[in-house]
Amino acid sequence: MQAYFDQLDRVRYEGPQSTNPLAFRHYNPDELVLGKRMEDHLRFAACYWHTFCWNGADMFGVGAFNRPWQQPGEALELAKRKADVAFEFFHKLNVPFYCFHDVDVSPEGASLKEYKNNFAQMVDVLAAKQEQSGVKLLWGTANCFTNPRYGAGAATNPDPEVFSWAATQVVTAMNATHKLGGENYVLWGGREGYETLLNTDLRQEREQIGRFMQMVVEHKHKMGFQGTLLIEPKPQEPTKHQYDYDVATVYGFLKQFGLEKEIKVNIEANHATLAGHSFHHEIATAIALGIFGSVDANRGDAQLGWDTDQFPISVEENALVMYEILKAGGFTTGGLNFDAKVRRQSTDKYDLFYGHIGAMDTMALSLKIAARMVEDGELDKRVAKRYAGWNGELGQQILKGQLSLGELAQYAEQHNLAPVHQSGHQELLENLVNRYLFDK
């Protein structure tokens, strides 16, 4: 078979001095960082949808890319051609993982029977590709938002027959993920939200999606899937308001339906931007709540109110993200999936490599800086000092429930408490972070 990326053998590490745009300058898979291989820290994945399914179309224009597998033809054969190119790309990019939606890899067909038959054939194709290339599946998911049947959502749809169709897709995609050795299964909100409250029963829709997620958990245990279930928060788009708005909202939902021990979160940087949060905030919140799972590494544009899905290029932003992840013990089943796409004007097929290479170097350099922050320990020391009072007698009595509100008020009066504010030293800490970032 003719190689699609025929001008490239494989992307390799050449070091910081390299000017080769098709080489890594910072990502060295075998380099040890805090005693662990860089590849094992970062667990990079490339996504199927933006990389091989998007044709460059947007709201104002038709497809701009001339991909051979996006031409008219027999759908299943084109899907197999797309898989050939995808795994050529994964291998040459040197990523250990990939991710997909069901209909990214397989034609949907005109019925559930066709959908399942097509998907079963393509799962066999993907299994063979994985065996041949050594590339593994980080996570799979089902696209329950593109087809017009999902215009009013999938699990939150007012029609239980649509709910049932979505359940069929999710079961099939979960089974496929399990068969392919996937390490996680993702549930993104899609169109689980509302356009207007005038035709929406919020309590009803919340009960529906809560039951749907409980059924997903039940099926996971029934099938013996050992991977992690992940919800991906997003505040809006495509609906006006999504029910999985941000990490904290998802945690409240999980608690309500008794799922907080069963499901974690897959955090996307651009979705944090849309929610009015920093990427750092969402990562730290998930870790604090015990539901951190995986990351969709990309970036948004603070001046635009939609999901631009650009490749991450900010070491300043991502060093702090990697710092939080390292302090929490790193990824277990999760990783860094590049949910990012080249720009519509980037029509050269090698632009796909340029985008991913830059992103991988960004995250690798961020990891190394984060490791220096962990090794130095100065930030942690200053935070510990700020909260040191809570390790004292009074602080511990409060936290252990040994003082009531009235007793605490009495204590304050008896001891003539007159606390004085202590500086938070924000500027000092920002300067400290800059030293890690820019001092060699």
From Swiss-Prot:
The active site is at H101, D104. Keywords: Carbohydrate metabolism, Cytoplasm, Isomerase, Magnesium, Metal-binding, Xylose metabolism. Binds 2 magnesium ions per subunit. It is an enzyme of class 5 (isomerase). GO terms for molecular function: L-rhamnose isomerase activity; magnesium ion binding; xylose isomerase activity. InterPro entries: Xyl_isomerase-like_sf, Xylose_isom_bac, Xylose_isomerase. It is found in: Cytoplasm. Its EC number is 5.3.1.5. Transmembrane segments: none annotated. GO terms for cellular component: cytoplasm. Mg(2+) 2 binds at E268, H271, D307, D309. It catalyses: alpha-D-xylose = alpha-D-xylulofuranose. Mg(2+) 1 binds at E232, E268, D296, D339. GO terms for biological process: D-xylose metabolic process; L-lyxose metabolic process; rhamnose catabolic process. Its cofactor is Mg(2+). Belongs to the xylose isomerase family. HAMAP family: Xylose_isom_A. Homotetramer. This is Xylose isomerase. The gene is xylA.
